[in-house]
C-alpha cells in the first residue's frame, strides 16, 4: 500500500472504505477517455443541486445580514459590498439551475466523461474564486469593521460559523480539484489558485507532501474506469450535502442570534 494519502482514501476520514484505501495510480493515462453513462450524468446533476443549495445558503444568510446592517448607518459601504456579492451569487445560482444536462448530452453512452465534467468544473472554479473573495471579506475585514464602527460585536459572525464557512469552502474546492485531476484533465484554465498557492508555499517550507493533513496537498488519484468515478462522485455528493447542511445550520444560528439581540434592544427602549 502506498504511504501517501489521497483524496480517495482520506478526506477528513469521511471516505472510510477499503475500496478507497487500496487504490494505486494506473500505469497508463486513460482517464480522459472514459465514457459517460446515464448514471454518472445523474450524479453530475446531483452535484449541481448540492452546489445550488450551497449558494442559496449564502444568498439567504447575506440577505438577512444586509437587513440587520441597515440598523448601523456607519456600515453603509460594507452593506453595499454585500449587496453586490448577493447579486453575483444569485446570477450564478440561476445559471446553474438553468443548465440542462439532457439537452447538452442527449446520448450519454456515446460521450466521453471529461466532456460532461469540463463545463461543470469550469463553472465551479469561477464560482469558487468569487466565494474565496467573499469569504475573506465576510470573515476578516468586515468583522473588524463592525467592531471598529459600531463599538460592539452584536453583528459579528460566531467563531463556529466562520469555521463552518472555511471548512465547507475547502471541501468544495477539493471536490472541484478531484473532478479535474481524477480524469487527468490538464489545462491551465482548470488550475485552482488556492491549491496552487498552498502547494507553492508547502514546497518552499519543505513540507512533506507524501504525509500531510492539509486537504489541498493530499494527492488525487486518477480513476481507472467510469464505475470508480461514479462511486467516488456519489460519495462526494453526500459529503458536500452534509457540509452544506452544517453551514446552513450555523448561518441560521447567527440570524436567530442577531434577531434576538435587536428584539431585546427594542424591548429595552
Swiss-Prot record:
InterPro entries (UniProt xref): RNA-bd_She2, She2_dom_sf
Localisation: Cytoplasm; Nucleus
Which superkingdom is the protein from?
Answer: Eukaryota
Which keywords, in A-to-Z order, does the entry hold?
Cytoplasm, mRNA transport, Nucleus, RNA-binding, Transport
Output the Gene Ontology terms for molecular function.
RNA binding
Q: Which GO terms describe its cellular component?
A: cytoplasm; nucleus
Swiss-Prot/TrEMBL GO biological process terms: mRNA transport
Q: Main location per UniProt?
A: cytoplasm
Q: Which SUPFAM superfamilies match?
A: RNA-binding protein She2p
Q: List the disulfide bonds.
A: none
Which family is this sequence assigned to?
Belongs to the SHE2 family.
Q: How does it assemble?
A: Homodimer and homotetramer.
The protein's job, in short, is: RNA-binding protein that binds specific mRNAs including the ASH1 mRNA, coding for a repressor of the HO endonuclease. Part of the mRNA localization machinery that restricts accumulation of certain proteins to the bud and in the daughter cell.
Which protein, by its recorded name, is this? SWI5-dependent HO expression protein 2
Amino acid at each position: 500500500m502506498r504511504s501517501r494519502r489521497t483524496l480517495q482514501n482520506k478526506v477528513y476520514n469521511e471516505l472510510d472504505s477499503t475500496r478507497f484505501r487500496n487504490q494505486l495510480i494506473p500505469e497508463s493515462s486513460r482517464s480522459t477517455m472514459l465514457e459517460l453513462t446515464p448514471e454518472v450524468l445523474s450524479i453530475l446533476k446531483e452535484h449541481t443541486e448540492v452546489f445550488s443549495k450551497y449558494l442559496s445558503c449564502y444568498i439567504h444568510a447575506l440577505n438577512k445580514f444586509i437587513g440587520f446592517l441597515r440598523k448601523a448607518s456607519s456600515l453603509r459601504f460594507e452593506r453595499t459590498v454585500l449587496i453586490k456579492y448577493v447579486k453575483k451569487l444569485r446570477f450564478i445560482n440561476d445559471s446553474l439551475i438553468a443548465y440542462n444536462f439532457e439537452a447538452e448530452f442527449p446520448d450519454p453512452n456515446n460521450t466521453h466523461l471529461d466532456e460532461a465534467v469540463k463545463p461543470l468544473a469550469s463553472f465551479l472554479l469561477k464560482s469558487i474564486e468569487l466565494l474565496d473573495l467573499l469569504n475573506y471579506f465576510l470573515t476578516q475585514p468586515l468583522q473588524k469593521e463592525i467592531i471598529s464602527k459600531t463599538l460592539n460585536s452584536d453583528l459579528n459572525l460566531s467563531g463556529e460559523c466562520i469555521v463552518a464557512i472555511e471548512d465547507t469552502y475547502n471541501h468544495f474546492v477539493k471536490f472541484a480539484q478531484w473532478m479535474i485531476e481524477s480524469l487527468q484533465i490538464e489545462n491551465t484554465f482548470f488550475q485552482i489558485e488556492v491549491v496552487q498557492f498552498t502547494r507553492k508555499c508547502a514546497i518552499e517550507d519543505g513540507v512533506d507532501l507524501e504525509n500531510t493533513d492539509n486537504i489541498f496537498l493530499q494527492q488525487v488519484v486518477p480513476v481507472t474506469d467510469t464505475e470508480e468515478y461514479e462511486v467516488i462522485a456519489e460519495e462526494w455528493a453526500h459529503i458536500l450535502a452534509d457540509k452544506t447542511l452544517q453551514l446552513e445550520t450555523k448561518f441560521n444560528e447567527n440570524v436567530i442570534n442577531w434577531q434576538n439581540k435587536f428584539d431585546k434592544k427594542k424591548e429595552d427602549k
